[in-house]
Each structure stands twice: as C-alpha cells, then as structure tokens.
From Swiss-Prot:
Xenovulene A is a natural product exhibiting little structural resemblance with classical benzodiazepines yet is able to displace high-affinity ligand binding to the benzodiazepine site of the gamma-aminobutyrate A (GABAA) receptor and could be potentially used as an anti-depressant with reduced addictive properties. Residues 1-36, 1076-1095 are annotated as: Disordered. Residues 1-20 have a biased composition (Polar residues). This is ABC transporter asL7. It is a multi-pass membrane protein. GO terms for molecular function: ABC-type transporter activity; ATP binding; ATP hydrolysis activity. It comes from Sarocladium schorii (Acremonium strictum (strain IMI 501407)). Induction: Expression is significantly up-regulated under xenovulene A producing condition. Belongs to the ABC transporter superfamily. ABCG family. PDR (TC 3.A.1.205) subfamily. ATP binds at residues 822-829. ABC transporter; part of the gene cluster that mediates the biosynthesis of xenovulene A, an unusual meroterpenoid that has potent inhibitory effects on the human gamma-aminobutyrate A (GABAA) benzodiazepine receptor. Keywords: ATP-binding, Cell membrane, Glycoprotein, Membrane, Nucleotide-binding, Repeat, Transmembrane, Transmembrane helix, Transport. GO terms for cellular component: plasma membrane. Glycans are attached at residues 265, 1017, 1371.
Length: 1432
C-alpha cells in the first residue's frame, strides 16, 4: 500500500512540514521523519526539506512543460488480415512483396498546454488515442508518424532537440512490467537512482550513499520498503506480488527524475486505494520539484481525479476537451449532458464517448459523433481561451530562446564531468559501463546456479569425454584420437556460448526501456555484459580444458599448454561475439526466441562442417571454400593441431608390410605423412599432407581469431545501440480465412500504435444481426444452493503458522450475484480457490462446504464454472472453437453433440459475441481485446453449463469503467437467467456496486466483516456500518469506498473498532447462522431431487470426467493438431532447419568418393545431421508449455479431460510433420552425397533407399519423443532444453561416429550400447556404404619400394591376404602404392558395424521411441500431477 497516511492529510490542508534545511535524510536518526528507514518517515516533510536544501545550495530543479498545437498523428495499415496456417501462408506472399498500405489518421488536431508543475489526466476509452498521445509527447513514436504542421514547444526546446539531446527528460511509462526478475527490488531501484544521479549532490553526501537513501525514500513513498530484499520476479519466477511489481515499475520511472512524465494506464492492477496513493505522489512531485505529468487512467476514483490540474478527453482520436479538470464536468453539462447521481466525474467524462451511456438533458440537441464533439470543442469559449494561452506561451518561450539556453545549462550542471551536452545521458559512457557491471555482478550473485551448473557440467563432461582418450601415447595409433580430441575441444569451446542468445533475447525489452529512460547506452550494457562474462568464461574454459588437456595426454610442455588455453579462450570469445551479434538482427525480425535461434543453429552446422576436421581443406568444394576463410573455428582448430603436432615425432605403431623390420628402407609406416625407412613420423608432415596445415600459421591464426573477435563484438555493440527488437502490431481482429461474418465488417480504426492491451478494432454490426436472446436452456439456471460455514485456511511461513482465512461463512443462491470484497491481501482469491476446490498449494483447509447440505463430490469441480482473473486461452483457436471444446468435454456424455453445439450458439448470442465468434483469440497486442477476452473467459465456463454456480475472479480488474459496466451487465444477465454467481471485486464505483445483491466483506487476515444484502442504493449495507462508523455516509459518496474508510481499510484511515467482533455479535450474524443451519438440514430435500432426476440418464455424470477417455482423446488431439497447423512459423522453421541443414550437408559432401577419407566423410555426414537435434527439441518445447499451462491452470482443475489424454495427444501431434520432414531430409541428403550409387553398385537400391528413409523417420520420431521426455518434468522450456542438451551430449559422443567402440575403454561400452544413436549410425552406414569397393585418394596410399627383384604384389602378398587392402599396380617394381582398404565392409567392421544387423537396429530405435513415450507420461505424473489431498 502507498504510504499516504501523513501525505493525505497534509495534501488536504495544504500545509507543509516545519522541517526545513535539515539533513535531507535525517542524519540517519531513527526517530526523524526525514529518515526513510524510520517508522516516523513523512514523505511530504522529506520532499519539502529536500527542495529547500537544494535551492539553498544554489541548485535548481529542471522544470519542463509542453505546448502542442495542431497535433496530428497517423499510421499505415494493411488490408484485412486473416489467420495464417501451414497451407494459406503462401497466399500472403504477394501482399508481403507488394506494400499495399493505407494511411489511417490516429490523432486529429490536438491542442494544449501542460506547464511545469501541472498534472493532466488523459481520459478516453480503448482505441481513443490515449497511448498514442502520451507516446507523442514523450517522443516514443515507433510505428507511427507526426504531421508536418504539428507544433511542439518544450519551454523553448524544440521537439527534435528534446527527443535526441534530452531524451530522458520526457519519458513514457507503459503499463507492462519488465525487470530483471532475479534482482531484488532494492537492487533494481538503486540502479535507477545511480543512472540519473546529478553531478552536484546537496550537503556533500557521497554519491553511493545518496543513491541508496534516495532509493529508500522512493520505496517508502510507494509502500514497498518491506520488499527491499525480495526478488522482483515475473510470471514464471517467484518474487513480489503483481501489485508490488507494478509499484516497482512506477518507482523506477520516478527515479528517472524526468521533468515531463507520461504514464499510460500505470494503475492497472492496482486497486483504487493504491491508484489514489500513486496520484498523490505525483502531486507531491509536481508541487515541490516542478515536474509535470500526463496520466491516462481507467476507472479513476474521484479523489484521484481531484488531484489533477487539467484534463483532456479523447474520443476515437478526436480531442473533445482540454482544460482545467474542475471545469470539465460543467463544460459537458453545458453541452446538454447530465451526470447521474453518484457517478464520478471521470466516469461521466468517459461516458461521453459511449452513446448508450451518456444521458441527454431535456431540451438539448448535443453532439453525437466524435467529429461533432470535436467541432463543438473548437467552437467553444474554452477552446478560444486555450488558443490565447498557447499564443502567450509561444511568445514567452520561443524556440531556441533564452529559456532553452537556461535549460541546457541546467542540464549540463546535472551531467557528469566529461559528458557531452548533447548527450541525453547523465553519466559518461565508462560510468554507465561500470554501473551496468555492478548490476551484472548482482545478477550473478543473486542467481549463481547457472554458473555453478555450467562449471560443474564442464568439469563432468571433461572427465567423461577425456576418459575416452585417456593418456594417449605419442605414437601413430593416437593420430586419429588426437584429432578427435582437438576437434571436440574446439567444438565445446566454440559453442559453449550458444545459449547466450536465449538470455540476451529475454533481457532485450528491459535494455530498450531503460535506454528510453536515458539510463545508459544499450551498447554500454552489451559492453559491460561482455566484460562481466569474462571471468565466468575463464572459469568455464579452465574447468573443461585443464582436465581435458592433461587426461588425454596432449603435448605436455608449458608453452604448448598455455597456448592451448589461450587459443581455446579466444575461440570462446570469438564465437560468443558471433552469437551476440546475430542475436540483435534476429530479435529485430523474430517474434519468439525459438525463431531467433534458427540462424544460430544453421551457423553452428556451417562452422562445424568447415572447421577442417570433418572436411579437410583439400576436400572442400570450391563453391563453399569461402566459409572456411570466414570461420574462426577453422583458424582455431588449425592452430591447436599445429600446437599439438608441429616439431614432434611420433613413434610408428603399424608398418607396411606388418612383418617388416622397422627402419628397413623397404618398410613404411601405415599413416599419412610417413617416409619409407623411418620409425618415426613427423607431426609437421602428417598435418601438412592430411589437412594442408602449415606450422607457420600457428600465431597468425590466433591473430586472425582475435581480429574476428574484435570485429564481432564491435558489430554486436553497434547493433545493440541502433537495432531495436521487433515491435508487436496493434490489436486487430484476425479471422480464419473465409470465416469473416457476412453481417459484420471490421473497421480498422486507429492504430498500430495503440499496441496496448486494449482494442484498436471496432466491430460494427448490421441492424439485422443484433439480437437480444436468452435461450430456454440459459433461462433454466441452477437450482442448488452452495453454502459454507467456518471456512479456515492455515499455512506455515518459515515454520510459523499463519491463518489466511478465519471462519468465513456464506452462501450463494440461484439467481443472485454475491460480491466478495476486501483490501489487498485479505484472502479474496484464496477463499474463491478454497470454495471452488482448486487450492493446490500447501495448507490446511477446514470448515463445511456443502451443496444442498451434501459434501462436495469428485464431480464438483466440473459442475462449477471458475472464470479466473487471468484470461487464459489457446491463442490459435477461435472464439467459437474455444466454446465448443468446453461444451464437448464438460457436458455429460449422454447429451447429443448437436444439442451441445446449439447451446454454444446460445451462449454466443447471450454474450453478444456473434460479430467475432470466428475471430482468433490471438495474444495481447494481436487478437481479442481485454473486454472480448473477459467475455470469452466467462463464455467458456458457461458453455460447460455448470449446474451449480459460477465463480468469477476480478472480472473488472484493469478494465476501463465502460468495459467494466459491460462485464457486470453480462453477469447480471446470467443471474437473471437463474445462474448463481460469486464474484470478487476491487472497490467498484457506486453505480457498479449497486448491481450486486449480496456482499461478503473480508478484512486483513481473512476475517469476515459483513455478509448480507446490499439493499437498494446500498441502504442495508450503509445502515449496518453507520451503527459503529465515526461518520455517516455522505449522500453522494460511493458506499463501497465509504465502507472501507469506515473499517479503516482505505489509505490514510484507521478504525479503533474491532469490526470482526462487531459482526460476530450482531443480529445479522445470528440470522446468517440460522439460515446456514436450515440449508444444511433441509437443503437436500428441496433441491437435490430435480438434479438427481436430470442426471439418471448417465451414471458417469457423477464421475471425475463428463465424457469417456476416447471422446476426450478425439477432441483434444484435434485441437493440438489445429494448434500446430495454425502456427506456420513453428512448422516452417522446423522444416527450414531440417531442409537447409540436410541440403547443406548433402552439397558439402556432394558425390563423396569411395576413398578412405570419403568413407569417413560419409560417416561424418551422418554425424553432422545430429547437430540439429538440440534445436529441434528446443523448438517444440514452447509449444508444449503453452498447452500445458492452459491445461494445468484452467482445464485440469475444471476436470475437462484426463492428464493421460493430454500427454498422449501432445506426443502424437508432431508425428505428421516429422514424417514429412523425414522425406525432405532423406531426399536432400541421400541423393546429393551419392549414397544411392553405392546401393546401385551393390544391386540393393530399393531396399537400402527405403531403409534409409525409414531410419530418418525413426530418428525424427525419437527426436520428438525425446523432447517430450525432457520437457515432461521440467518447469520451463529453458530447463527442459538444458536437460535435453546434457543428455544429448552423452548420447551423441557415445554413438560410435567420432570414437569407435573398440577404441573406448571397457567401462564406457555400456553407454555406447545405451545410446540410441549408436544403432542409428550403424544402420545408416550399413544402408549407405556397405558392400562396395574402395579406391584410395592419391595422398592415402602408403608408398614403399620392394626389395630388389620383387614386384609390389610379391612383396606385399601376405599383407594383402592378412589385413586386406590392394596395390595400385601389382606388377610395379618400385614406388609400391598400397591402399589399406579395398572393401567398405572392412571399414565398417573396424567400427564394429555389421551389415546384417541393419534391420534389427532399426527395430531397436523404435524401442527407444516407446521408452521415451513411456518415460514422458510417467515423469509427468510423478513431477506435475498433484497427489493425495492436493489432487485437482
């Protein structure tokens, strides 16, 4: 709660504190009202003293007003859009190529003045232009344009200068809350204080101390001091509450110290008490510091409105009033409108924009359309007075006049020494970097888990991987092992930073917001992030490479080891720079992190392939050789190879002939680079002949890698500074193609700019399409009475018990609406959850909760509707489909499908959703607006036709007054149809409050203060509270607000009365107890008979679910397939990844020859395919999370369908797309490489071609089910991806491609046997290269001379007959060219692959698929399903 107890009284009487000229923070005196840490802290006293001290010290506050004239704003829209799916997305390509845009005017001729120290409230319904107006004033104008003749004057500062050189002096604060979730509230706000801390600080207080204490002041000001050490959190990470997070957002903007502040619906999510406190704080800032502000508010309380100096009313982009706030009501009354009794002034002003709500006075003919209202305004005396005021302002403050120079000098005095005067930032660049580094350190300390996990993971992986090549000896048998080790080291170091893309993508909105506040350059944050990551990268690099280097016995000399570490570290840095660089443009063109990851994934494959190991330089095709030149991994790998081999000689392990005498001139070592007659092989010769590496390139390559690193980071900083993330479009209704209703037309008024949570789409319905229909089924509401007595809810916090609900009593009867109210934290939602039997958290619930005198059975949850505060819906479904889904699964099985569908249409008519029944739900920003979503939330519950009652949690929260009125209209209509409704409310207006029949009021601690009728004009309620209240309810007061003031629950109020005791000793309480006793004893006799009679047709209606499992499965699997089909970005990004990578590999290994190296290349072509598994898995996880969130939060508690159906349908949904992808990958990979030619040579083209496709199919099925296995038990997609990556690294390295089974230590053979990829590699290589002859390349022959008088064949006959191979010329007598392989099956046998096991291995892969499915279902039940008393 805002700390306004003392602020309120001092604001009302206009007095100021007597405390002046004292230490601005009270000298840390615990009893000083200037000390923010004191219990006596007084915000107004502190502000007064701070202003006094500042002015006495010779400093001034920057003050800024704004004058605007003839302000016009416009944007461009495209023709009517439709929902894209996998099939019709191609139809949109012509529209993408041909820009057919239409200009739409958003703001029409706005005029006004907001002087320094003035507050202006901006009123208007959704789509009226409030957001665009505030963005225009603050300079946040992405996505729309300002008319050339628009005039702006900021106290002599031009519009262009303000929004460049003084950008942070006029800020726009949106209603969304974006913060680093792992930072505490204190750290978040202290950072903001530091970013805008002035150069000269009063009383010589040290900078750090000043920022800390100023942060404490603001936290005390907004009532969040108790959250100082609590993490901010977000929707997924536990932290402060939603209301507290909103106040953190407000506090951060306050600390920006901007002279002009534009607040866009920043009170959303706050109750009226906190909204009033927020406005009072703005009033205090304006009064003492001269700050001016413009604030848009929905459901503004009267006491908040009274704090504003000026008001402007907007109506569909037209300004219909601008002037003194206390004269606005009189202006519209003179136009001919009447303000109803107890309607607040802001509600009255906003009602001018709703024809059905404004009341015309008798004898008047007032304006009706927005244009008529605007014309009336421009012809009014008030408008003429405004124009006169504007003319005087222009004369007094000419552009670039004396005032502008004064402001510039004042701003310069605020900036740090060395900062440019034209810079919008307060601190210098290096100060910004240092500040961001401190924040990065705080983020690391607050969340050390990832760093520890990465370090330990690196260490463990190093142990496992290096143990495969433990203690390699300096002989030629270790050549391949050393090359694999160095390749693995390079790959690990290079791609250790790939997940940085996800982290940086997530923080981009935070960085862009704070850059708009002029806290720091985005590049400064990027620079500090790089610097702060250096120690972490060093730690990660050392933890892996230290173990890896010495366990594998690489070149053990100090110089070579430290060179290895240096090269590895720069490889890490260079690749980190690349991933950071490509992240920025990816974010600019991508809506999701999964799409942004695709370029990184494809780049990984390119860099791995052209690192120089899998495809040596002399094997690279000319068309793609350039990739190697641009590849930092390739330069790093060459340097590490040179570091390992150069200047060394390796003892020969295998000779040709094998029985020859070492050192004999007719005997040669059987490796590339050997010289006949030598017993050692030169490392330089080996890498030169095998890889075309030159020892002179060792340090040159490091220089190139460093240069690339500098270039990559430079580009990263540049793009961070100038490239913004992709903005969402404005809200428009999107229909399925061909489903736009014929009797409606979509009028896309306004903007891509009102991209708030409110509509920019207006549905205009034809007269013949409008109906007032309440169907017969809807009229037959529930007959049962739900009642509860002595309900308590107890939990333990830090081992101490705490009671959340304290003996709550009440009932809900058919045909009535009961309001559940109370202060924040009173337990309203908790009570609703307990009554609805949906409380899954820890805690003990006691008390009676009965239906017609009977205990709730397991069918209770599906027989009640629960419209939650969060509007959770599947974004790809239409409104009608959402209702049909609920009706088919939640209504009893014996009811015909046609009847269920007909009832859905009745619900659509009742809720007046016909015009957008076939519109797609979408997401906030692109789809249904807030009101439409709220209607859909209620409609989904009604479609289930709950026979008992409907729970509704905060249906009006965050809505404007007119939308709230419409929602309550809906609830009242349902109530009149016989529905029982229990609804929580946040301090409604008087007119809204009177719509309810009964009230249950809770105080702190969940204690009942009142339960009973409200009465006509709230008379019954008022009469009860006036018995003990200090003051009676004034005639024009809002009874809901007066009631809270009476019990001491409103800001600045206290009460010495124990209202719970008053209630429990009142006659009303006794009557409640008597009625509860009567309901318990006689309720079942009067109400249960009819319900039992109606349900005798279906015994299962009393069961957990309304329909059988098979019916559940059919309906759910259809929706899951539908979701995938209507998410073309998800499907085509998967196809693009599969297609591009497989084609790339196919072309890189185009017509791979049947040489020794060619066989290795074809094996690597198989191994390269596996590089995309991680990305394929991470792509499907967010889709799963979307469905799972909806299921666990809404559908599972409602007993809509079984968890088994959910899991099976999710797993099956990917099969068709992976089946298509398998065909594409097979064709683009199998034929370019030339594997079909091998099958033709062997005469098995049909069988082996078909087997290869089946292997692709089985592999992709394994990938899909492996992803579900990993995400089934994980909380987030990121956690699932990390689990998948760790397991996949093990599966991949033990598949037998890089290291063969006979080279593995015996201990690790079990992992080779357990890896599904080992069976896949075996079958794919069998189908691809078995049963063909091998022809060595020129550099693969071992050349020796036979003894005098012998031919080559005579000399090497035993060698050929024993180990195989062949001679290029059997009859040659010198330069015998011996190839160690003649048949590919010998190559396969060396890696323990048998052609005869190909089909068996294919079957084993399917066993792993079945295992993944079983494990996914089992782990979901173990990790995610509530058990025992928590079962819902």
């Amino acid at each position: 709660m805002f700390d306004t107890t003392k602020l309120q009284s001092s604001t009302q009487d206009g007095s100021t504190s007597s405390v002046t000229g004292e230490p601005i923070f009270g000298a840390n005196d615990p009893n000083s009202e200037l000390n923010p840490s004191s219990s006596h802290f007084n915000v107004r006293a502190w502000a007064s003293n701070y202003a006094k001290v500042t002015l006495e010290g010779g400093s001034q506050f920057r003050r800024m007003g704004v004058c605007f004239q003839n302000l016009n704003a416009f944007g461009f829209i495209t023709p009517a859009d439709y929902q894209k799916d996998v099939a019709n997305i191609w139809l949109a390509l012509p529209g993408m190529l041909i820009r057919n845009r239409k200009r739409v005017n958003i703001l029409h001729q706005f005029d006004g003045i907001i002087r320094p120290g003035e507050m202006c409230v901006v009123l208007g319904p959704p789509s009226s232009g409030c957001s665009t107006f505030l963005k225009t004033l603050s300079g946040d104008r992405d996505g729309f344009f300002i008319g050339e003749d628009s005039y702006f004057n900021y106290e002599g500062i031009s519009d262009k200068e303000l929004h460049t050189a003084h950008r942070g002096d006029a800020i726009y604060t949106a209603e969304t809350d974006v913060h680093f979730p792992k930072l505490t509230v204190s750290q978040t706000l202290e950072f903001a204080a530091q970013a805008r801390c002035p150069r000269e600080i009063p009383q010589g207080i040290p900078r750090q101390q000043f920022c800390k204490q100023l942060k404490d002041v603001v936290m005390g000001m907004y009532g969040i001091s108790h959250t100082a050490d609590t993490k901010v959190g977000n929707d997924y990470i536990r932290g402060v509450s939603g209301g507290e997070r909103k106040r953190v957002t407000i506090a951060e903007a306050t600390l920006s110290n901007a002279p002009l502040q534009c607040w866009d619906n920043c009170t959303r999510g706050l109750d009226s008490a906190n909204a009033i406190g927020f406005c009072k704080t703005l009033r205090l800032q304006s009064e003492f510091f001269g700050q001016s502000c413009a604030v848009s508010m929905y459901q503004a309380p009267q006491s908040a409105y009274d704090l504003f100096d000026k008001a402007t009313v907007l109506y569909q982009g037209h300004q219909i009033y601008f002037g003194p706030a206390d004269e606005a009501k009189a202006y519209f009354e003179r136009l001919g409108f009447e303000c109803p009794s107890r309607q607040t002034t802001p509600d009255f002003l906003t009602s001018m924009t709703f024809p059905e709500e404004r009341i015309t006075r008798a004898g008047f003919n007032p304006p009706r359309t927005p244009e008529e209202f605007a014309a009336a305004w421009r012809s009014s005396p008030e408008y003429k007075a405004l124009q006169t005021d504007i003319s005087e302002y222009k004369t007094k403050h000419p552009i670039d006049g004396p005032n502008a120079g004064v402001y510039r000098e004042l701003k310069k005095s605020y900036q740090a020494r060395g900062q440019r005067i034209k810079s919008p930032y307060t601190l210098t660049y290096m100060q910004q970097v240092q500040m961001c580094m401190r924040r990065a350190w705080n983020r690391l300390v607050s969340d050390p888990g990832p760093t520890i996990v990465v370090t330990m993971g690196n260490f463990v992986l190093a142990l496992i991987m290096s143990s495969l090549f433990f203690n390699m000896q300096p002989d030629t048998d270790s050549f391949y092992g050393r090359e694999v080790v160095l390749f693995m080291a390079v790959m690990f170091n290079a791609f250790a930073s790939v997940l940085e893309v996800m982290t940086l993508y997530a923080q981009r909105p935070i960085v862009e917001k704070q850059a708009r506040y002029a806290f720091y350059h985005p590049s400064a944050e990027a620079y500090s992030s790089v610097l702060m990551d250096l120690p972490i990268k060093v730690l990660a690099c050392v933890s892996f490479n230290l173990v890896f280097y010495f366990m594998t016995n690489l070149n053990r000399t100090p110089g070579n080891f430290f060179f290895y570490l240096l090269a590895s570290f720069f490889i890490v840095l260079s690749m980190s720079g690349i991933f950071r660089f490509i992240k920025i443009p990816s974010a600019a063109f991508s809506r999701t992190v999964q799409q942004a990851m695709i370029p990184a994934s494809i780049l990984m494959v390119f860099l791995i392939t052209f690192a120089g190991f899998m495809v040596p330089i002399n094997y690279m095709l000319p068309w793609c050789r350039w990739i190697n030149y641009l590849n930092p991994v390739a330069y790093g790998f060459e340097s590490l190879m040179i570091n390992e081999y150069a200047g060394r000689e390796f003892r020969c392990s295998n000779y040709i002939p094998f029985d020859g005498t070492p050192g004999d001139p007719n005997v040669a070592c059987n490796v590339v680079g050997a010289v006949a007659g030598e017993t050692f092989v030169s490392g330089d010769a080996h890498i030169s002949e095998a890889y075309s590496y030159d020892a002179a390139h060792k340090w040159r390559n490091i220089g190139i890698v460093i240069a690339m690193t500098i270039f990559n980071y430079t580009m990263c900083f540049i793009t961070s500074e100038y490239v913004s993330a992709k903005k969402s479009k404005g809200e428009i209704l999107v229909f399925r193609r061909g489903f736009v209703p014929k009797n409606t037309h979509v009028n896309k008024i306004t903007d891509d700019l009102e991209a708030r949570s409110l509509p920019v789409t207006k549905i205009v319905e034809s007269p013949e399409g409008s109906k007032e229909k309440v169907g017969g089924e809807l009229q037959s509401g529930s007959t049962s009475i739900f009642h509860w007595r002595n309900v308590c809810y107890d939990i333990k916090i830090k081992g101490k018990p705490r009671r959340i609900l304290d003996n709550v009593d009440g009932w809900v009867k058919p045909g009535t609406m009961t309001a559940l109210m109370g202060v924040s934290g009173a337990g309203k939602t908790t009570l609703l959850d307990c009554l609805a039997d949906r409380r899954t958290g820890i805690g003990i619930i006691t008390g009676e909760m009965l239906v017609d005198g009977k205990i709730r059975d397991e069918s209770f949850q599906r027989k009640t509707g629960y419209a939650q505060q969060q509007d959770l819906h599947l974004e790809t479904a239409t409104v009608r489909e959402s209702l049909v889904f609920s009706a088919l699964l939640r209504r009893p099985h014996h009811i015909p499908k046609a009847e269920k569908l007909a009832y859905v249409e009745e619900v659509i008519d009742l809720l007046e959703m016909g015009p957008y029944a076939d519109a797609v739900v979408g997401v906030l920003g692109e789809g249904l607006n807030v009101e439409q979503r709220k209607r859909l939330t209620i409609a989904v519950e009604l479609a289930a036709k709950p026979p008992l009652l409907l729970f509704v949690d905060e249906p009006t929260s965050g809505l404007d007054s007119q939308t709230s009125w419409a929602v309550v209209n809906l609830l009242e209509k349902l109530s009149k149809a016989g529905q029982s409704i229990l609804c929580t409310l946040h301090q409604p207006s008087a007119m809204l409050f009177q719509r309810f029949d009964r009230l249950l009021l809770l105080a702190d601690g969940g204690k009942t203060v009142y339960f009973g009728d409200i009465g006509e004009n709230s008379s019954t309620l008022v009469e009860y509270f006036e018995r003990k209240a200090k003051h009676p309810c004034p005639p024009n007061a809002n009874p809901a607000e007066w009631m809270l003031e009476a019990i001491g629950a409103a800001p600045g109020t206290t009460s010495e009365v124990d209202w719970q005791h008053v209630w429990r000793t009142s006659p009303e309480f006794d009557r409640v107890q008597e009625e509860l006793s009567r309901l318990r004893e006689h309720g079942s006799q009067s109400n249960s008979h009819d319900s039992e009679k109606s349900e005798t047709k279906a015994v299962t209606y009393h069961g957990e679910f309304a329909v059988p499992l098979w019916t559940q499965f059919v309906v759910v699997i259809e929706r899951v397939f539908q979701q995938s089909w209507r998410t073309p970005a998800y499907i085509y990004s998967r196809f693009a990844l599969c297609g591009v990578v497989s084609l790339f590999i196919g072309l890189v290994f185009l017509n791979s020859p049947l040489s020794v190296r060619g066989l290795q290349n074809q094996m690597f072509a198989v191994f390269q395919l596996f590089a995309i598994v991680g990305q394929l898995v991470s792509q499907q996880m967010p889709q799963f999370i979307i469905q799972r969130s909806l299921y666990e939060v809404r559908e599972r508690p409602a007993k809509t369908y079984s968890w088994k159906v959910f899991m099976v349908s999710q797993i099956l949904s990917d099969i068709p797309y992976y089946a298509l992808a398998s065909v594409m990958m097979w064709a683009l990979w199998y034929f370019p490489i030339g594997l079909y030619k091998n099958a033709e040579v062997a005469g098995q083209e049909t069988e082996r071609g078909a087997l290869m496709w089946l292997l692709f199919l089985a592999w992709l099925m394994w990938v899909s089910t492996f992803g579900h296995f990993c995400i089934s038990f994980s909380e987030t997609a990121e956690a699932g991806a990390n689990a998948a990556n760790f397991m996949y690294v093990l599966v991949n390295f033990f598949c037998g491609a890089l290291i063969t089974p006979n080279q593995m230590p015996r201990f690790w053979i079990f992992l080779y046997r357990a890896s599904p990829l080992s069976y896949l590699v075996s079958s794919m290589l069998s189908a691809g290269i078995a049963n063909v002859e091998v022809t060595c390349a020129a550099n693969e022959y071992t050349i020796i001379d036979p003894p005098m008088g012998q031919t080559c064949y005579e000399y090497l006959r035993n060698e050929i007959n024993t180990i195989g191979g062949y001679l290029l010329d059997n009859n040659a007598t010198e330069n015998c060219k011996f190839c160690k392989l003649k048949y590919s099956n010998v190559f396969l046998s060396e890696i323990e692959i048998e052609y005869g096991t190909r089909w068996r291995n294919f079957g084993i892969i399917w066993v792993y698929v079945i295992f993944n499915i079983s494990a996914a279902i089992t782990l979901y039940w173990v990790a995610r399903m509530p058990k025992g008393h928590r079962k819902v």
